């Protein structure tokens, strides 16, 4: 997997984020789509109403596979399957490649579902969340 990621990062239009790049926000603002494994980033990116690709072909750590798969299921949010509907699932690299092309050509294909689940998770998506927090804090000193 590492070799494949390093190969992709050699392209001029690809930036492979390092572990030290812990904040995804700057990348989300400029990205056309998100490719992710099972991550909360899927939900966060959906709020931007941009295509999300779920890479389901990456190998989990050994202690989450086989007879230990219950650990992974226990760790994941109980509602995760419901929210997986906002992403296009890719079970192989070949499928991912096709899905990237399709989602770039049709970025609004899952727009309604993305916005539905983003509103369910984050509430009103009008850009005024900070203002509402400040107003609440000022009113409830």
Language-model segments: what does each one mean?
Residues 1-141:
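Nucleotide-activated sugar donor-binding and catalytic core shared by glycosyltransferases
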């Amino acid at each position: 997997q590492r070799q494949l990621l390093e190969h992709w990062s050699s392209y001029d239009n690809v930036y492979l984020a390092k572990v030290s790049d812990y904040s995804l926000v700057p990348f989300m603002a400029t990205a056309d789509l998100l490719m992710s494994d099972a991550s909360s980033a899927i939900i966060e990116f959906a709020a931007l109403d941009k295509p999300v690709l779920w890479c389901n072909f990456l190998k989990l750590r050994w202690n989450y596979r086989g007879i230990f798969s219950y650990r992974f299921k226990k760790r994941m949010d109980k509602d995760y399957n419901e929210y997986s509907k906002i992403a296009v699932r890719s079970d192989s690299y070949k499928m991912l490649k096709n899905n990237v092309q399709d989602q770039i050509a049709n970025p609004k294909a899952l727009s309604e579902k993305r916005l539905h689940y983003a509103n369910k998770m984050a509430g009103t998506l009008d850009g005024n969340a900070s203002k509402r927090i400040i107003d609440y804090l000022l009113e409830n000193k």
